[in-house]
Amino acid sequence: MYSGTDNRLDMTFDTFKKIVDDTGSEIFELQLEGGEPLIFPKIYLFIEYAIATGRCAKVIVLTNGIELEKNLRRLVQIHQWYGTEFHIKVSVNYHLLKVHDNHLKTLADLVFATELLPKFNIELNTRKRHNDQWIDAEIDAFGLSEINHSFELQSYGRMTGSNYDGVKIVQNIDSWEIYAVDGKCFGIDLVARSEYEKKLAEEANNEHD
């Protein structure tokens, strides 16, 4: 989704339910992303509804990790209750490490706390500026290199027009789709969805002014 700080839009449960129900009898994986999904009030309603269909093979949460410590116990409880596989993908970048002291130490502690849960996985997705190799070195110092996927920033959204490469899509399934906050499907076009949601956010903000 568009993750600007001016975004006041949340997906409704009815919209989410329709997306899930429209998958019919198919087995699916649910990926929740932001903004920041761990501050979304209905995140657990969404997760448990998807799992309750009996067709959700995996829950994936994309987070900056700041609220993960507060939410970890509940996420693990849902995982253990239903037996559904969970993947928590934590974004790491220069800004997060400079603003939040001990961020990597906290993440290392959370990884250690869940290491005996083979189907509850925490991974790092590191986005680097040019010359940010020091981030990989810090991640290695905390023993997190094995779960780290390191990339340079991508030229879309706020970074459109920058001297970085375009979008690189990494997925472990062949058939997947992304949805905007209002339920509109964009296939696999991350850029189009980002621009669409940016426009929705601007329109919503204009209505509040």
How would you describe each model-predicted region?
Residues 13-33, 40-136:
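Radical SAM/AdoMet-radical enzyme domain recognition
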Residues 9, 39, 178:
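Aromatic-acidic/polar surface patches that form glycan- and anion
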Residues 6, 33-34:
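Short, contiguous strand/loop micro-motifs
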Residues 1-14:
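Canonical Radical SAM [4Fe-4S] cluster-binding loop centered on the CxxxCxxC motif
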Residues 121, 135-150:
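Eukaryotic C-terminal
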